[in-house]
């Protein structure tokens, strides 16, 4: 399954990559944005791509034909200030964060992100790497109220209490160890026809638990707090979010930076996909792109 980059032309307009520039892609995953950026910063440019997926980074390194100027490092984008210092790299001219999943990750990650037919037997790890505790272990002991709160807050699931109760009751009898196990428990807790067929009944719960398991909102807040340690003055950040909580964090952080004079908006309102892009790439439907230029 080929990964199609979301809002590609709009990202390029915000980043404005040019020959000799240094651009960081903190979520390099499928590499679609990266290829377009590389075409524009060479010759003379430098590129750093990071991702927590060790297999993906290994693949990118194996196919890298310019290791003196193009670097792929396994790491969390939240730690980019430390990664740049450790690797002896300067502050960047551009930073891209695409906070969505690549088609490859969703199709068969081996980590239980999806409950599709090809993924349902995957272990319920739900983490990008091995640094964080697998979700299957978290679910063995998480209190019912905390579980319900997470599913409601991060997934917007109205029936979070029903789902949390079903998970707790099920784990007393049998552990939830695969993606399919969790999906079955959630579906059984909800009435047929719930969501009116628009999405699978388990989708919101999977989203919520993935966000929790990887501290996705905490990572986003951390990199936003450290943006001046990643970007040089005049450097540009382009951030694509797919969830209202993520977008709100970016919106408020950019607003605070602009008010304090540390940065200026490229676009005050989020850029969204056109009808044509949504038709060709349904993943883009919920994407929102915000951009900012660092001044200090």
Residue ranges, per PLM feature:
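S-adenosyl-L-methionine-dependent methyltransferase catalytic core, i.e., the SAM/SAH-binding region
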Residues: 1-296
């Amino acid at each position: 399954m080929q990964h199609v980059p979301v809002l590609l032309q709009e990202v390029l307009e915000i980043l404005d990559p040019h020959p000799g520039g240094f651009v960081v892609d903190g979520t390099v995953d499928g590499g679609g944005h990266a290829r377009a950026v590389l075409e524009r910063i060479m010759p003379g440019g430098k590129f750093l791509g990071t991702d927590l997926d060790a297999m993906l980074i290994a693949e990118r390194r194996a196919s890298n034909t310019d290791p003196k100027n193009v670097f792929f490092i396994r790491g969390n984008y939240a730690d980019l200030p430390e990664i740049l210092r450790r690797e002896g790299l300067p502050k960047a001219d551009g930073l891209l964060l695409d906070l969505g999943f690549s088609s490859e990750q969703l199709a068969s990650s081996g980590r239980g992100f999806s409950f599709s037919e090809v993924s349902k037997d995957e272990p319920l790890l739900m983490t990008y790497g091995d640094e964080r505790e697998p979700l299957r272990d978290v679910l063995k002991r998480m209190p019912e109220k905390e579980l319900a709160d997470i599913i409601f807050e991060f997934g917007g699931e109205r029936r979070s209490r029903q789902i949390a109760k079903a998970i707790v009751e099920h784990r007393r009898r049998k552990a939830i160890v695969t993606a399919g196990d969790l999906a079955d428990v959630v579906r059984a807790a909800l009435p047929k026809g719930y969501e009116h067929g628009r999405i699978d009944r388990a989708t919101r719960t999977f989203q919520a638990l993935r966000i929790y398991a990887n501290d996705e909102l905490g990572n986003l807040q951390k990199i936003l707090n450290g943006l001046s340690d990643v970007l040089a003055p005049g450097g540009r950040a382009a951030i694509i979010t797919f969830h209202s909580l993520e977008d709100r964090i970016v919106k408020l952080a950019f607003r605070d930076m602009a008010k304090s004079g540390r940065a200026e908006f490229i676009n005050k309102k989020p850029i969204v996909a056109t009808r044509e892009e949504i038709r060709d790439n349904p993943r883009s439907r919920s994407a929102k792109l915000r951009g900012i230029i660092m001044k200090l």
